Curated annotation (Swiss-Prot):
GO CC annotations, alphabetized: acrosomal lumen; acrosomal vesicle; extracellular region
Compositional bias (Polar residues): 64-78
Residue ranges of the region described as Disordered: 64-89, 119-158
GO biological process, one term: single fertilization
Stored Pfam families: SPACA7
Protein's recorded name: Sperm acrosome-associated protein 7
The species this protein was found in: Homo sapiens
Gene that produces this protein: SPACA7
InterPro entries according to UniProt: SPACA7 (IPR029301)
Signal peptide per UniProt: 1-24
Major subcellular location class: secreted
């Protein structure tokens, strides 16, 4: 599903790129008719319309969750990566569902969102563990939990915001993928070296 969404976006971007280079052919209009519009204003309207569509697509991409975004590894198929198991994200979705089951929503906890767009972009496009700064909870809003309510799964999430928890899970799952990929490539190199 994510691959088809990525293909649709790719086709849309290619269409926009090609559309700017094409020239619109004017329709034959009877001179003096009330529907006659100068050719230059048609081009301006079309470019404004295309700009609005592009902005909407970009905003829609920003609204999607990281699990919905297509990865470059899944959209590009090369002979080098032909042996990769395409179901490698199954563990990541299990972590995500486990996270959702363990979340406890409390009105006393506030989530601070950083306005630093560079960190946000780095977290989205790079390794989240490199730029992760830890939970951002406002002072005095920590929830006190009695010892009866604490268990091994809930204690690790009690002071984290939802965004922080998701970023941690993404870091874990991408780290597992990276580790598996390193093992696979080193095994391939050893087998090629022995031949």
């Amino acid at each position: 599903m994510a691959v088809s969404q990525g293909d649709g976006t790719l086709c849309f971007v290619l269409l926009l790129c090609c559309w700017q280079e094409t020239e619109l052919r004017p329709r034959t209009v009877i001179p003096g008719s009330p529907t006659e519009i100068p050719f230059s204003s048609k081009q301006e309207d079309m470019s404004e319309l295309l700009d609005e569509i592009l902005v909407q697509e970009i905003l829609d991409l920003n609204k999607t969750t990281p699990s919905e975004m297509p990865s470059t590894a899944s959209t590009l198929s090369t002979p080098l990566h032909a042996g990769i198991d395409e179901n490698y994200q199954a563990g990541g979705s299990e972590n995500y569902h486990e996270l959702l089951e363990n979340l406890q929503f409390s009105p006393g906890i506030e989530v601070k969102i950083s306005n630093d767009e560079a960190n946000a972009n780095a977290n989205l496009h790079g390794d989240p563990s490199e730029n992760y700064r830890g939970p951002q909870v406002s002072p005095g809003s920590e929830k006190s939990v009695s010892s009866k309510e604490k268990n091994s799964k809930n204690t690790q999430y009690e002071n984290l915001s939802i965004l922080d928890q998701i970023l941690q899970n993404i870091g874990r799952s991408s780290g597992n993928i990276f580790h598996k990929e390193q093992q696979r490539t080193s095994a391939q190199r050893r087998s090629q070296g022995s031949q």
